[in-house]
Swiss-Prot record:
Cited InterPro entries: Mur-like_cat_sf, Mur_ligase_C, Mur_ligase_C_dom_sf, Mur_ligase_cen, Mur_ligase_N, MurCDEF_pg_biosynth, UDP-N-AcMur_Ala_ligase_MurC
Organism for this UniProt entry: Synechococcus sp. (strain WH7803)
Primary location class: cytoplasm
Keyword Chaperone attributed: no
Domain of life: Bacteria
Protein name as annotated: UDP-N-acetylmuramate--L-alanine ligase
Keyword tags: ATP-binding, Cell cycle, Cell division, Cell shape, Cell wall biogenesis/degradation, Cytoplasm, Ligase, Nucleotide-binding, Peptidoglycan synthesis
Localization, UniProt: Cytoplasm
Pfam families named in the record: Mur_ligase, Mur_ligase_C, Mur_ligase_M
Organism ancestry: Bacteria, Bacillati, Cyanobacteriota, Cyanophyceae, Synechococcales
Length: 486
């Protein structure tokens, strides 16, 4: 491995507004590791903020104009201010920064600058980009490449979403939600799939396709998923991968066995069989993500044998079928699924564990209970029927209130309406609706059974279900999770 340590030509301090966010904290961590003077604020000192504070960041527990006065006293005046799309124009700290005429960067500007510093793999797509980015990072790490990584989830091999590596490559997750990924000029762009989402930003599917085409055009080379009909029709890629065919694609992994705790597949390069692989994670979607990741590493010149030998070490990133623990015989799992296709794929994987009797969990579950928190009113309105169909595969569905993510309420758009559509589609469907998170916890307690898999899905605060259950347990029966392969 050739060492290549890259530093940005930034002499000023850097201040992150909303530093605790998953994308912002990764960037802050990398700048800290590379010796930059970093400060950051958020509404509370979350675990991410505490971790950054331990790493040397000056941390503020509020987003207030007074933070800049405090930085003046610390001789950190006139910082470059970094924001994400989640920070509104009326944010008091951002207003103060502009009144001071400070330089304000969007987080994508900073990530684009990092990408420009060294050969980079930027991974985009509607679904699977965090998992694919994590697998690329894990395989490169195992192969001795020590990549820099900027990921939208916790990468198990680093226990972090940001890692300042010494190797030649940078791996970045390219978020399409606000269109800012068109700024990236990566050595290799990867697109996992494409489906309409983020209707608060995109007019329609054509608008989303055009944005991803601009991303692809900005990359020196493009790798894409041949199995995705939108990609195969609308994109010109330098290389393609598939889990459905081995002919006329550059990389393929054809499933031999899809089991509840693992996936076995035949691996092909340029149509030639090169060996059989076993992944310690279930699901056809995870196989596709892994084949895409293997293809990206191969296109960057990493020997195949160095990659295959580390497949057994793969783990999904945090909040991707993340086993949290056992509560009175119920196995609690957290997943970030918040689009109908993601919900369907996650439930299919969970149902396979129930039906096959094989599972990466401590015990094979006997029944699936889906706990779903819709994310954003706009997404729930756009995909209400699709969400309802996807959720029907669970024996029991518990719905949390919609997580607004800053959006205003929309008349008639709520979890009760989603439940009504589910019952219109299937009169036999068992679905219950909670009006608060506390009521959701009560529903789980009352209606779940020992040996159930309780699968909490959503991009909001439904991931607090495990902690709420364990804190409310008066019998002290909650137990910490053991290490899992997936």
């Amino acid at each position: 491995m050739r060492s290549l340590v890259c530093t940005l030509d930034i002499q000023s301090p850097v201040h992150f507004i909303g530093a605790g966010g998953i994308g912002m904290s990764a960037l802050a961590r990398i700048l800290l590791s590379r010796g930059h003077r970093v400060s950051g604020s958020d509404r509370r000192l979350s675990p991410a903020m505490e971790s950054l504070k331990t790493a040397g960041m000056v941390a503020f527990e509020s987003q207030a104009a007074a933070n800049f006065q405090a930085l003046d006293r610390l001789d950190r005046s006139s910082p470059i201010v970094v924001i994400s799309s989640a920070i509104p124009d009326h944010n008091p700290e951002l207003v103060a920064a502009r009144e001071r005429q400070l330089e304000v960067w969007h987080r994508s500007d900073l990530l684009a600058a990092l990408i420009d510093q060294q050969p980079s793999i930027a991974i985009a797509g509607s679904h699977g980009k965090t998992t694919t980015s994590t697998v690329v990072t894990t395989l490169l790490h195992g192969a001795g490449e020590d990549p820099t990584a900027v990921i939208g989830g916790i990468v198990p091999c680093y226990d972090s979403n940001g890692h300042a590596g010494q190797g030649r490559l940078l791996v970045a997750e390219a978020d399409e939600s606000d269109g800012s990924l068109v700024k990236f000029r990566a050595s290799l762009g990867v697109i996992t799939n494409l489906e309409l989402d983020h209707t608060d930003h995109y007019r329609d599917l054509d608008d989303l396709i055009a944005t991803l085409q601009r991303f692809g055009d900005g990359c020196k080379r493009l790798l894409a998923n041949q199995d995705d009909p939108i990609l195969s029709e609308h994109f010109q890629a330098d290389a393609w991968w598939s889990v459905q065919r081995s002919d006329n694609v550059d990389f393929a992994g054809l499933p031999v066995a899809l089991e509840g705790d693992r996936t076995i597949a035949d691996l092909y390069e340029q149509g030639t069989f090169v060996g059989q692989i076993t992944l310690p994670m279930p699901g056809l979607h995870n196989l596709s993500n892994t084949i895409g990741a293997l293809a990206a590493c191969r296109m960057e010149g990493v020997p195949l044998e160095h990659l295959i030998s580390h497949l057994s070490e793969l783990k999904t990133p945090g909040r991707r079928f993340d086993y949290r623990g056992d509560w009175q015989g119920r196995q609690i799992v957290d997943d970030y699924a918040h689009h109908p296709s993601e919900v369907a794929a996650t439930l299919n994987m969970a149902n396979l564990m129930v039906s096959s009797g094989r599972s990466p969990l401590p015990r094979s579950p006997q029944r699936l209970v889906a706990v779903f928190q819709p994310h954003r009113y706009s997404r729930t309105q756009e995909f209400q029927t699709e969400f309802a169909r996807a959720l029907l595969s669970a024996e029991l569905v518990l719905l949390a209130p919609i997580f607004a993510a800053g959006e205003a309420e929309m008349p008639g758009v709520n979890s009760e309406a989603l439940a009504s559509v589910m019952q219109e589609l299937s009169t036999q469907q068992s679905v219950l609706v909670a009006s608060t998170m506390d009521e959701l916890v009560s529903l789980v307690k009352e209606h779940s059974l020992p040996d159930d898999l309780v699968l909490a899905m959503g991009a909001g605060d439904v991931n607090s279900l495990w902690s709420r259950l364990s804190q409310s347990s008066s019998e002290g029966q909650a137990s910490c999770p053991p290490a899992l392969a997936a």
